[in-house]
Amino acid sequence: MTRVAAHAPATEARLPEGDDKQRAVEAMFDRIAPRYDRLNRIISLGQDRRWRRHTVAALRLAPGATVLDLGCGTGDLCDVVAAAGYFATGVDFSAGMLAAAHTRAPLARADALSLPVPDASTDGVVSGFALRNFVDLDRFFRECARVLRPGGRLATLETAEPASPLLRAGHHIWFRRVVPFVGATLAKDAEAYEYLPRSTAYLPPSGDLLALVEAAGFAAVERRTFTAGAVQLITGTRR
């Protein structure tokens, strides 16, 4: 299995890896769960709803299709899946996030890298801003391929860095200065909202990310960006 390592600049604390990462991320999301949705709206300037609609629209499945939302958090993406006429099931490893969930979709506490789901049993898989929190991206995409039926669709939404140097500079100011300040002020958890921007270091370059998806068993792998390149949507079809 290929693990994607994070390399923090020397001036920053090194990001955790492996089991340490999983424990740290789970504990962090348990802490911030009660305020997570409110902070999402503020940090994204309300754009997160639009991004989720784009994610679900990219599935292009028949009405009544079954869709797993991996790293579902409080269920925002599950609700968009259901509104599109699909049957959503949410999966997350954070008990705190599941306890704070507002969705009517069924939810399960499980590890997205080892799902309690039969092979080729679902039509679609989505995730929203969860990739950087998984310990092993290669294993994650292979697990998505395992549970999807042939022809099933993957759509995963994640942060990105704008290509333009000017836009990238503005993005860094917002993500690395404003977001931690907002998190410390409103969520009373500076540590969590300093980690979240830095966690983008776990993501490989876009070309490598697409290659991981293809190697896991997906065809027609594509990448779209939104909001001046600050967000990316990766899609693919199970071979």
Residue ranges and their predicted role:
Residues 35-38, 45-63:
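Conserved alpha-helix/loop element of class I SAM-dependent methyltransferases that forms part
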Residues 138-150:
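A short glycine-rich, Lys/Arg-flanked "PGG" loop and its adjoining helix->strand segment in the class I
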Residues 219, 225-239:
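Core SAM-dependent methyltransferase catalytic element
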